[in-house]
A protein has these predicted regions:
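Local cysteine-cluster metal-coordination motifs and their immediate loop/turn environment
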Residues: 135, 212-213, 234-264, 295-311, ...
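Feature captures the FAD/FMN-dependent oxidoreductase FAD-binding
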Residues: 486, 491-495, 543-593, 690-703, ...
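N-terminal Rossmann-like FAD-binding beta1-loop-alpha1 element of flavoenzymes
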Residues: 491-515, 640-648
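FAD-site-proximal beta/loop scaffold in flavoenzymes
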Residues: 597-628, 712-769
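Ferredoxin-type iron-sulfur electron-transfer modules in oxidoreductases and energy-metabolism complexes
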Residues: 223-225, 367-386, 407-439, 457-484, ...
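FNR/FR-type flavoprotein reductase catalytic core
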Residues: 91-239
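Ferredoxin-reductase
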Residues: 20-101
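Rossmann-like dinucleotide-binding cores of NAD(P)H-dependent redox enzymes
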Residues: 157-166, 514-517, 521-552, 556, ...
Length: 769
């Protein structure tokens, strides 16, 4: 798991003897089964060791490719490889099939999904259609090993499409081969072979894997005989880790996430008609991508990168003299320089200074530029003037309002005297991500809400603006504001590279620990990258903060899931002494109302991940996306604001639908103001109760319940209640659901011994265990 040579090489050497680091994701062997079906053996030693029957991986062929789920057909722990069987059906699979032995796949992450439930059922029919035989094979092996009698049916349109027959026969007691045209085996479809076995002897269970229509008819057949039948669903996915909800389906009347709850389900409970419709969600977008396939293959590597982007012009003033003062001197309220500052202006004079206004891009400009940051940053002159407003309180209540207890007066007073680098050092001493926090933290509800100015009915000091200014200044100067400490020799693992994981990594690195951060996605940053748009938090800002952690000694590994790719026990064997789980609350909530699984209704997580992380709006990338023209965003938080403002930049007419009034909106006031300036419509005191789909299964209308406010609830906000009999039906072609998130179950399901508490959060006791 450890991206740099020391850690990852040790793990690979432990699990797969002497495999070099450079061979990861290498195509070791490629075999062509038919015109469009290929078998790949790919080097992935950690996945090969940990995979089980029924698991899948997510593949990203190259940097512009979408994330594609593929079920693992086999694994060789000695060679450190996994086997995948791929059929050319879309752009990503076609790109993969064009690769040759010796080529590398950009990303392989897994094993994912819940493994097949294996026990001695008795007599089991295993039915595979087309490439479905490949994921069926490891299940056949596992069931046979458990003592079952295995009767296998493999089918294809013709002889050329029958795959893995010899391997299936090796682990089966009997095998029937079916071809549609009778060119090999018996003529007919897979259900004929299944029914032949049913008539031959008692069948305890059926496992069917293949095209969805095949699995549906298998279930209809076995349902007549009351035979339990499991199917494996290969649905649309983006992340594959339970983060987005793109793979959701109705199973037994309830919404399930295929990547977490599946991919195998009781076929009798699957809403097949819904699945068929959802599988066609991006058909038009994928067709367009396929038309430009040759352009994708031939295009030179000219992808834009923001990492070296020019810094904002605001605040790029000439640097103040570099300070040699110690951190204690920078923070000492009784230092002579600090006393002189307090004497230089009377409190009334400081109170009389007007709060600084953040320079912003005009609404007309910014809605046409998706990746340009709206807030442009303040200049040195503006920052020093705002810093003078700070009263340098002896008992600063603003610090009490900060979740990480930043010494706010000290960093602000350093700005006032022109020692910006010193201010950055004070910030970095407590906060690992000041450039991020200065942009996205809800200061008006935290530090600024405790500012003494508010007690005088004056605007709070712009602490967030000043934090951003100092952090950006340090980034531009390129100075390391925190020295790398001497190592204490203790290794700690951080699960997740979002704001929580990165902050913890920074805190531990500053204390001399050897920190290793493990991320399931292909990009470091978590929600900072997939969730927050660049017009609010540019990627290059996050990248610099990550690079600062690397300079402190932190190491990062992507495409690795703790508990699945590598277990806690294996990490303990590698010498890790502590583990921090920062996997976040990434499971999107849905409202569970009629029609919610219609095409073009997606979670804000999925929508923002496609646009932000996968850059689906860029024609150079492969991730498909449907861009609505009349978009509803459900919710009133920051994620709802990010979603509606993103949709606006993609050309939509956007309406926020929120069940309370604007006064109760949890979003930052600045985000609400920006949304209004950009032309977002607000429909407050309304709540969706049903979605209506057209004949293709795509949403076309939303039925909204009109609400009114009642008494305050536990959050202090007035509770919404429906006005009986009063509804409003509105037209829409895309709905983005942003009604909150829950803890992602992937990590608790993958790590043994974790205790779950309220709302499935991980229980942590006073002993920090």
């Amino acid at each position: 798991m450890l991206l740099y040579l020391h850690g990852k090489r040790n793990l690979i050497h432990r699990f797969v003897k002497s495999k070099p680091l450079t061979s990861m994701n290498k195509i070791i062997q490629k075999q062509q089964f038919s015109e469009k079906v290929f078998k790949f053996e790919i080097e992935a030693p950690l996945i090969a060791k940990s995979r089980k029957a029924g698991n899948f991986v997510i593949i990203r062929v190259d940097k512009n490719s979408e994330r594609m789920p593929l079920t693992i057909a086999d694994a060789d722990t000695r060679r450190g490889t996994i086997t995948l069987v791929v059929q050319e059906v879309g752009l990503s699979s076609r790109k993969l099939c064009r690769l040759s032995e010796g080529d590398y796949v950009e990303d392989v992450v897994g094993p994912l999904g819940s493994p097949t439930h294996i026990q001695n059922f008795g007599t089991v029919v295993c039915a595979g259609g087309g490439v479905g035989t490949a994921p069926l094979l490891p299940i056949i092996k596992a069931l046979k090993k458990a003592g079952n009698r295995i009767l296998s049916v493999i089918a294809g349109r013709n002889k050329d499409l029958i795959i893995l027959e010899d391997e299936v026969r090796e682990y089966s007691d009997e095998v029937i081969v079916m071809t549609d045209d009778g060119s090999y085996g018996e003529k007919g479809v897979v259900t004929i072979g299944i029914e032949k076995f049913i008539n031959q002897e008692h069948i305890d269970k059926v496992v069917a894997i293949g095209p969805p229509i095949m699995m549906k008819f298998c279930c209809l057949l076995t349902g007549k005989y009351n035979i339990p039948t499991d199917v494996s669903l290969n649905t649309i996915m983006v992340d594959g880790t339970g983060m987005c909800g793109a793979c959701r389906l109705t199973i037994g009347g309830k919404t399930k996430f295929v990547c977490i709850d599946g991919p195998e389900f009781d076929g009798a409970l699957v809403d097949w008609d819904e699945m068929f419709k959802r599988m066609g969600t991006f058909k038009a977008a994928e067709r367009e991508e396929m038309e430009h396939f040759e352009e994708h293959l031939c295009r030179p590597e000219t992808a834009e990168c923001n990492c070296g982007a020019k810094a904002q012009t605001h605040g790029a003033d000439a640097p103040a003299a570099f300070t040699t003062e110690t951190l204690e001197q920078l923070k000492d309220r009784d230092a002579e320089w600090r006393k002189e500052l307090r004497k230089s202006m009377k409190p009334k004079e400081r109170m009389a200074i007007e709060r600084v206004e953040m320079p912003e891009l005009s609404p007309e400009y910014r809605i046409a530029h998706r990746k340009e940051e709206v807030n442009q940053g303040i200049t040195l002159e503006m920052a020093q003037r705002e810093a003078k407003r700070c009263l340098d309180c002896a008992k600063p209540t603003c610090t009490e309002g900060c979740p990480v207890s930043i010494d706010i007066p000290s960093f602000i007073k350093n700005i006032e005297r022109g020692n910006i680098q010193g201010a950055a050092r004070v910030l970095k001493n407590t906060s690992s991500l000041p450039a991020v926090c200065g942009r996205v933290c809800p200061q008006e509800k935290q530090c600024e809400s405790r500012c003494m100015h508010l007690k005088m009915n004056e605007p709070a000091v712009a602490i967030g603006y000043l934090e951003r200014f100092a952090a950006d200044y340090a980034q531009r100067c390129g100075e390391q504001t925190t020295e790398k400490p001497e190592s204490n020799g203790m290794k700690v693992a951080v699960v997740g590279s979002g704001p929580s994981g990165l902050s913890f990594a920074g805190d531990m690195a500053k204390r001399g620990y050897e920190v290793h951060v493990f991320e399931a996605l292909h990009e470091i940053g978590g929600v900072l990258k997939y969730g927050i748009p660049e017009f609010r938090l540019p990627n290059h800002i996050v990248d610099v903060e990550i690079e600062n952690l690397r300079k402190l000694g932190a190491e990062f590994t992507t495409d690795c899931i703790i508990g699945k790719t590598v277990t806690i026990e294996q990490l303990k064997e590698e010498g890790f002494k502590g583990f921090f789980v920062g996997s976040g609350a990434g499971l999107p909530n849905f409202m569970n109302i009629p029609g919610e699984n219609a095409i073009n209704i997606m979670s804000s997580n999925e929508y923002l991940t496609r646009v932000n992380l996968m850059d689906a709006a860029d024609p150079k990338t492969d991730t498909p996306m449907n861009f609505g023209k009349k978009v509803l965003v459900i919710g009133g938080g920051n994620t709802a604001m990010d979603s509606c403002r993103t949709a606006k930049r993609l050309g939509a007419d956007v309406t926020i639908v929120y069940r309370r009034s604007e006064a109760e909106m949890p979003a930052r006031l600045e985000e609400v103001r920006h949304a209004k300036e950009e032309g977002i419509n607000f429909l407050n005191l309304h709540n969706p109760i049903e979605y209506i789909a057209d004949e293709n299964g795509a949403v076309c209308k939303a039925v909204l319940q009109v609400m009114e406010l009642g008494e305050p609830d536990a959050s202090g906000r007035r509770s919404p209640k429906p006005i009986e009999g009063k509804t409003l039906t509105v037209e829409t072609d895309q709905v983005i659901v942003a009604v909150g998130v829950s803890p992602n179950p992937l990590v608790p399901k993958s790590i043994e011994g974790l205790e779950l508490g309220r709302k499935d959060t991980i229980v942590v006791y006073d002993c920090m265990q």
